[in-house]
A protein has these predicted regions:
Chain B
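Conserved anion-binding
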Residues: 83, 93-154
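Catalytic cores of alpha/beta
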Residues: 53, 74-85, 136-147, 170, ...
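Glycine-rich, proline-tolerant flexible connector loops at the mouths of alpha/beta enzymes
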Residues: 31-51, 67-74, 94-112, 158-167
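N-terminal capping/small domains of soluble enzymes
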Residues: 1-64
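Glycine-rich phosphate-binding active-site loops on the catalytic face of alpha/beta enzymes
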Residues: 65-70, 88-103, 150-165, 187-229
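Short, well-ordered coil/turn segments that N-cap beta-strands
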Residues: 38-40, 59-63, 90-92, 123-127, ...
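Active-site mouth loops of central-metabolism enzymes
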Residues: 8-24, 64-79, 101-107, 128-141, ...
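Flavin-dependent oxidoreductase catalytic cores
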Residues: 214, 218-276
Length: 589, 276
């Protein structure tokens, strides 16, 4: 079976029972792998939404048909119901873990139950072994990975949680390959709730390629295209994702002090250019990736990965902090403790505004870089103010009586693009299946960067159709599984070609787009069962009622409702955002 | 609706790499991409002509070489020699740069002779004349087109990509109106996505000089799944050369010409709010 190893293992940590899950070729054609297949398989054991910390909640580690090939993919997806949002959630991570899982002979793991004592899973030669992790409990992610490698193999790739996951912080990340994060949505907390400290994979099994000659040609062509593309071949390589800091700031939509302003006067000091001048030690890359957007950096006392754009913003402009060293070290701490940097920064921004309005009396002040590390650490251990911060911004703001000060959608913190500066991005945030996320439909590409078409960022016309298209393409890429940055260089026709050479199965562009739409709609169906609807496809009132006062997005606010109507119509959903029977029939759902 | 299929689009593309810093690896990549996508031609500097022709032998993809590039201010004999050598090295098309200074000085005979010298030296190769529209008024663009045809060129082309600005639909439309249907119009310079390419085709371009060729072809694939985004009503100022007039890059008389046009434009009042 080209592209897949042919084995998905379901394991119950309570009973230690394990079995192989059969997945038909038809199902693989319809959902590909990764995110799509993960969500599809999640619905089998969990057809009705249950508490994310219920032992019966499934936690799925899933690769795709392209994982482990040289098509820039060592990636994997973690799928479960999010404790932060209550939505279905998938979180993606790079590095090598996905490739290692397939190298160990397994396409995916479905984990249910709760172990009585801490355990970790060792995947080798197609077998999954449950091992005692009592000695690992309490270790940070770096030490955990080293300790597991010492037990299994120095070449093992390890996905694990740190103290934040153990303490079920609602935005705990799963960390692998030292500093790569499946960050969003609290998948680390679900892992901690199962007493599952880590999953280790090692092995040398190769992914079978259906058309080796075609694959070789295509790989060479893709390398050329990636190299020639100004984003993948230049900006991301030289400056990393933080190349966006100055660009977004110049567009007046760089969220500053919890989205109260769109221009940060000290943005230059936290930019990719400044990182390259000061902290950068070398660029780093995921498995077989020719781009290498990662930044290995060093401060006077510490060394680590990042900050990437979202983190440079979350701990920078969003908190009024321009101390790049403090930002980098907070990033390192999040990696070690296993925390999502976007939600951490978003929650701190909310805390600072709560303090300023007098709603919370704790001593959070804009620009206070010196206490950043303490706040991050306290959050991971849920101690002091960290006990409240560990809830995320939505629950924090509700608790202190000012829900409107949480910059979130469906409970997930909005990242580093003020939606008042890009109407399509606003719609993308509002309709994201997992909450305030920029990755579901990265409308910054057409609205700011002019790719694949330049759109008037302040107009609402035509945005619904493109948001839906981007969401569907992203679902395909997350399910294939490929790095999303490839979307800057190639499009759906190339993705179909890559899948054909690897799997031997033909997908037309139309069929592949239908796969993406099917996945997005299946996620929507879960969310509807979980109680989400039109009222949740919303933005914080700040974006609808308050205009930015400075910068090139000034005097703008979001016109969400008309776009939402358009969007539902494009999707074939009714006015409440529920997919119509005809839509479900067309998608075979 | 956009009535254009992938096959037609790729056959309109001169896949281009003209940077001063491009080495052989980049030219190899350019040729290999052109071969795999079936582009009409690759457009390269003279020093890369022989290599590109060798790499593309038998592929059906032509080689286009530039002459007098990017300033057009060399002597006619130097340009002619450059063109002839490129043809000997395998070029099927020559993109020459007009003598912009002479055109602006109204030395029309000199300009016509300059073009004719290159056309004659190019023998069977097709000759395109780059006007560098960012340095010219509308009247000068019309004059440049007429002189190009009189000098024996088969194509007129908007820009080098190194001048004040790239291709605008308004200029392409003017060039097409001037040369008629029998002469080609090539739009080049700063064309980054499929929508920009489509606008120029609609304006009358029969050939596109592109560095972003792959992304533009992929853009056509995406268009069919979300046509509204590509057909969204244009803000005229976003695609108007007057809005991009730049005193640092243009002769002051040309800058003033475009600014004057902008101030007299009926769109100004409606759309100026976008630039407050």
């Amino acid at each position: 079976m080209s592209g897949w190893m042919g084995k998905i293992v379901a394991i119950d940590l309570g009973s230690r029972e394990r079995r192989t899950v059969a997945v038909s070729e038809e199902t693989r054609r319809r959902f590909l792998g990764g995110r799509g297949l993960g969500v599809r398989l999640y619905n089998d054991p969990c057809p009705d939404p249950i508490d994310p910390f219920d032992p019966d909640n499934a936690l799925i580690f899933m690769t795709g048909p392209l994982t482990g090939t040289t098509m820039t993919s060592g990636r994997y997806q973690v799928v479960s119901r999010s404790p932060l949002t209550g939505t279905i959630c998938d979180s993606s991570s790079g590095g090598t873990f996905g490739a290692a899982l397939k190298g160990a002979g397994v396409d995916g793991l479905i984990v249910r139950g709760r172990a009585e004592r801490p355990v970790y899973l060792a995947v080798q030669d197609g077998e999954v072994e449950v091992r005692d992790a009592a000695a690992l409990w309490g270790l940070d992610t770096q030490k955990t990975q080293k300790a597991v490698q010492a037990e299994i193999s120095s070449k093992a790739s390890v996905a694990c949680i740190g103290p934040a996951g153990e303490n079920r912080v609602l935005f705990a990340a799963v960390m692998n390959d030292k500093d790569r994060a499946a960050g969003r949505g609290g998948m680390g907390a679900v892992m901690g709730g199962k007493n599952l400290k880590a999953v280790a994979a090692s092995g040398n099994r190769a992914v079978a390629i259906a058309d080796p000659a075609g694959y070789k040609d295509l790989t060479a062509r893709l390398d050329r295209i990636v190299d020639k593309n100004p984003v993948t071949g230049k900006s991301l390589q030289v400056l990393g994702t933080s190349v966006l800091v100055n660009i977004i700031n110049a567009h007046g939509m760089f969220p500053t002090e919890n989205f109260r302003r769109g221009v940060f006067n000290d943005a230059e000091g936290t930019s990719g250019e400044k990182i390259a001048e000061t902290l950068l030690e070398r660029q780093s890359a995921c498995y077989k990736c020719p781009i290498g957007c990662g930044r290995t950096t060093r401060t006077r006392t510490k060394r680590g990965e990042g900050p990437e754009y979202e983190t440079a913003w979350a701990f920078g402009a969003n908190l009024g902090i321009s101390d790049l060293t403090a930002i980098a070290e907070a990033n390192y701490a999040c990696n070690e403790l296993g925390l999502d940097t976007i939600t951490m920064g978003g929650t701190l921004g909310c805390a600072m505004e709560l303090r300023e309005t007098g709603a919370w009396k704790e001593n959070f002040r804009w620009g206070e870089a010196g206490r950043l590390l303490d706040w991050v650490t306290d959050t991971a251990y849920r101690r002091g103010v960290g006990a409240d911060l560990a809830l995320g911004s939505k629950r924090l703001a509700v608790k202190h009586g000012r829900p409107e000060l949480a910059m979130q959608v469906k409970g997930m913190e909005i990242p580093a693009y003020d939606p008042r500066g890009a109407q399509g991005m606003a719609l993308s945030y509002a309709t994201s299946n997992r909450g305030g996320c920029h990755m579901r439909a990265y409308m910054i590409a057409p609205e700011i960067l002019g790719h694949p078409v330049f759109l008037d960022r302040f107009s609402t016309a035509g945005k619904a159709e493109l948001v839906a298209l981007f969401q569907d393409v992203s679902a395909v890429v997350d399910s294939a599984v490929l790095c999303r940055f490839l979307q800057f260089a190639v499009g759906i026709s190339t993705f179909a070609e890559i899948l054909r050479t690897v799997t031997g199965l033909d997908w037309s562009e139309e069929e592949l787009m239908r796969v993406g739409r099917r996945i997005y709609t299946l996620e929507r169906l879960f969310n509807i069962r979980a109680g989400f609807g039109r009222a949740d496809d919303a933005l914080p009132p700040r974006f609808l009622n308050e205009e930015l006062q400075t910068g090139s997005s000034r005097r703008r606010r979001v016109g969400l409702e008309p776009m939402l109507d358009d969007y539902y119509a494009v999707r074939g959903w009714d006015r409440n955002g529920v997919p119509r029977p005809q839509t479900l029939a067309e998608l075979g759902l | 609706m956009i009535d254009l299929d992938r096959e037609t689009l790729v056959k309109m593309i001169d896949h281009t790499e003209l940077s001063a810093h491009s080495g052989e690896k980049k030219i190899a990549n350019l040729c290999d991409e052109a071969r795999s996508f079936g582009f009409y031609a690759v457009c390269v500097n003279g020093a890369h002509t022989a290599y590109a022709a060798g790499r593309l032998a038998g592929s059906g993809v032509l080689v286009c070489a530039v002459a007098g590039f990017p300033l057009g201010a060399g002597t006619s004999s130097a340009k002619a020699f450059e063109a002839a050598e490129a043809v000997r090295n395998g070029a099927s098309e020559i993109d020459m740069v007009i003598n912009v200074g002479a055109l602006r000085d109204k030395k029309f005979d000199f300009v016509r002779d300059d073009i004719r010298a290159v056309a004659e030296a190019s023998g069977p190769a097709l000759v395109k004349v780059i006007l560098e529209t960012g340095y010219l008024t509308d009247e000068e663009i019309v004059g440049g087109c007429k002189l190009s045809v009189e000098g024996g060129a088969q194509f007129v082309k908007t820009s080098t990509g190194f001048g004040a600005f790239g291709a605008f639909p308004e200029h392409v439309r003017l060039m097409r109106q001037t040369v008629g249907p029998a002469i080609g119009v090539k739009a080049a310079g700063g064309i980054k996505n499929f929508k920009e390419a489509w606008r120029l085709i609609l304006a009358g371009a029969s050939r596109l000089g592109l560095s972003a060729s792959v992304g533009i072809v992929e853009g056509l694939s995406l268009y069919k799944f979300a046509p509204a985004a590509w057909l969204e009503e244009e803000i005229p100022c976003h695609i108007c050369p007057s809005r991009f007039a730049n005193l640092d890059k243009q002769p002051k008389a040309v800058y003033a010409y475009y600014k004057k046009k902008c101030l007299a434009c009926p769109h100004l009042e409606k759309y100026n709010k976008y630039y407050e």
